[in-house]
Amino acid sequence: MNESLDFSPYLERWALQPDGEPFATHSSRLLPVRHRGAAAMLKISSAEEERFGHVLLNWWDGQGAARVLAYDHQALLMERATGGRSLLEMVRRGDDDEATRILCQAIERIHAPRPGPLPELTPLERWFDSLYAAERRYGGLYVDCANAARYLLETAREQRPLHGDIHHGNVLDFG
């Protein structure tokens, strides 16, 4: 096992008990745990952008997203979704309207104005670096897209962090 993705230090530091089998995504390893008797999820990230996500998830403070119980640069301890509803399953059963309504409610909650300063995140301009490189290298449609991105960035009136990975499989049921 990659030592940087070992759960042991966090199990000890945050007094966690494993409560299921570990699993992995393209950017993280996750372990269902118990924290002070409650269901929680320990997530250890291997991708830098995921680590910025820890800060953002903490800033959202459980409003439309999982509540963060503890975090550091590499690991995140968050409440675990234990409800039985799956938006993907709802869509498969033909209830896309209801699934989309729930998805939109989650988006509305996480993008609502918050008191206090924004967390320090990757500037949106940096996310467009690859678009600007493609503009220089390939021209064509990339020029139009890069110009549209510049216009939107220059004329933005409010700054709010965007989720960046919200979809039917990533909105969970917290009961």
Place the predicted regions along the sequence by residue.
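Conserved NTP-binding catalytic cores of kinases and kinase-like/nucleotidyltransferase enzymes
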Residues: 1-67, 71, 174
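An alpha-helical support segment within catalytic cores of ATP-dependent transferases
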Residues: 2-3, 7-8, 115-164, 174
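A short acidic Gly-Thr/Ser loop motif
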Residues: 25, 164-167
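Extended interaction regions within the primary functional domain
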Residues: 37-42, 51, 55-59, 111, ...
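A conserved alpha-helical element in kinase catalytic cores
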Residues: 38-77, 81, 85-110
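Hydrophobic residue at the +6 position relative to the catalytic HRD Asp in the kinase catalytic loop
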Residues: 169-171
